[in-house]
Amino acid sequence: MFSPKIIILSTGSELTSGRSQDTNSSWIANELFGIGFTVSKLVVLPDDPEAILEELRTLVSLATKKNPVLLIMTGGLGPTEDDYTLEVVCKLKGVSSVESVVARQRIEAFYKLRGKNFQESLQTAIRQISVPKDSTILNNEVGIAPGFIVSLGENVHLGCMPGVPGEMTEMFREEFSTWILKKYSTRELHSGFRFIWWMSESQFQKEFISKEESVTSGKVIWGVAAKRGYIRVSFQSNERALVDFLLKKLDEIYGPKSTLDVFEELPKLLIEKKITVGTAESCTGGLISKIFTDKPGSSTYFYGGVISYDNGVKEGILGVKKNTLKEFGAVSMETAKEMAEGALVALGVDYSISVTGIAGPGGGTPQKKVGLVYFGIGQKNEKTETHEHYFPFPRSSFREFAAHTGIYLLYNRLKRLA
């Protein structure tokens, strides 16, 4: 079997109207890249059954024996009248729909748990628990609606998943990716990635990519995605040694600024070393705490946070000295240091992250411009580290840059002490 031409389709009028962003397609494309597949095309369609049907027919016609097509579609599997995916796929295949036994059991349990009568809502529920006849079912372990895979000809398959990101990601990782790997043989591909902190895509391409013969010659497929505070660099090749060489070179050139996925690795470190953490946040307004608590099991290491937006909270709860605030200001290295040390005491933790800055658009001065931010990394019975950064971006972007940087700074300190 040849490697397929993969096309991702996202459905939803909220996407085509601009009311919501399509994050599913980029997530799926990244996951596929990690298992050795590349995406040829991304398509966004409204909740219009005729438009969806026409697009699918066009894409099906592209398939040949040497160029099989895999279509991956998200959205349109819900209970409402504008969820058309099941209807369209059944029409395209000329088959009826059947209930998924597993999905019916899940929805009955769902209604029972909430004291609702399943029979009274049967017609609505049926839309969510049905799949095309003779399809491969992708079970939904997070929500209700199952996904499914159907053959649309000898050389083309269509996989459909819910549009809800949490349901889709679990379904793809647990079931769909396994099916793809079994169905399509690929050359053995090796991949790896790094986060490079405080680096732009263009700067990285100029400094690194343009000078690497293995990349410019096409021996290695590379990709870079800009995030708030870092870029994610990935390499893929059928030669493991080439990927390892490039990753090692990144680590040598960029040192501690070259990391694995900090947001995955930091929780592992905290759990492994049985370390507890707390936060003292001003300009980020609790965003660092959110990043910690987004991870399942974070209660084992994250004790809590203080949102010290007002100076009175900095003084009253964190113990920042009045003279410090008066002499140096709320946005200062000195205040960040005392915030971090106060969080250690107030929360009874081993480590703390503090952040204070000017998110804008107002509040800046010639001496302290909008975008200036200070961090403190506190450690019980040890000297507190302080860091200064400057993120001259819109308010929401500034907050994300600052929050991500705070997580990185704690990770970096723990790695240095390991």
From Swiss-Prot:
Pfam assignment, any one: CinA
Q: Which domain of life is it from?
A: Bacteria
Q: Sorted alphabetically, which SMART domains does this protein's record hold?
A: MoCF_biosynth
Signal peptide extent: none
Extract the InterPro entries matched here: CinA (IPR050101), CinA-like_C (IPR036653), CinA_C (IPR008136), Competence-induced_CinA (IPR008135), MoaB/Mog-like_dom_sf (IPR036425), MoaB/Mog_dom (IPR001453)
Give the similarity note.
Belongs to the CinA family.
Q: What is this protein called?
A: CinA-like protein
Q: What is the lineage of its organism?
A: Bacteria, Pseudomonadati, Spirochaetota, Spirochaetia, Leptospirales
